[in-house]
């Protein structure tokens, strides 16, 4: 009976620690304070991706993206991060695609922190591991097939 009580108490304590760890109020406040509203999210993301590539000298005709991970990733007090696969078509029809990490800033938009083109990932497949979480790296590798 005593053994059962100890196991029960450890299960309760473990569940409590898990709940506390997943309800970090600081992380929640950073996400709420920086991620654009659902109504503006997609428009801001497309706008800021287009600006990033335009600033690199690409005359943008269209930008499309796919989320590589749903929702924001919050680490410490940094801006919340999002991970997308992007397809950029220029005005002459050339396509550029790759993996992007973005930071959501002040609910007003996104800043691209890292871009890895499809060709750069193919030439150095481990390069993404320093920037993207392991589950996101797996999704990126799926895109390369």
Q: Which stretches of residues belong to each language-model region?
A:
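Mature extracytoplasmic domains of secretory-pathway proteins
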Residues: 59-121
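Bacterial N-terminal signal peptides that target proteins for export
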Residues: 2-9
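Low-complexity, intrinsically disordered terminal/linker segments enriched in charged
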Residues: 114-145
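N-terminal export/targeting and maturation segments
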Residues: 24-83
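Hydrophobic helical h-region of N-terminal Sec-dependent signal peptides
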Residues: 10-14, 18
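C-terminal motif of bacterial Sec signal peptides marking the signal peptidase cleavage site
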Residues: 20-22
């Amino acid at each position: 009976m005593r053994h059962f009580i100890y196991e029960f108490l450890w299960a309760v304590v473990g569940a409590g620690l898990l709940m506390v760890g997943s309800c970090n109020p600081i992380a929640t406040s950073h996400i709420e304070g920086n991620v654009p509203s659902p109504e503006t999210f997609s428009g801001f993301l497309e706008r800021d991706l287009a600006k990033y590539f335009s600033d690199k000298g690409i005359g943008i005709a269209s930008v499309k993206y796919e989320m590589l991970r749903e929702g924001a990733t919050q680490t410490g007090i940094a801006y919340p991060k999002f991970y997308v696969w992007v397809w950029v078509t220029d005005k002459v029809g050339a396509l550029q695609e790759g993996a992007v990490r973005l930071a959501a800033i002040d609910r007003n938009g996104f800043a691209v922190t890292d871009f890895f083109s499809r060709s750069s990932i193919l030439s150095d497949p481990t390069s993404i591991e320093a920037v993207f979480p392991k589950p996101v790296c797996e999704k990126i590798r799926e895109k390369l097939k």
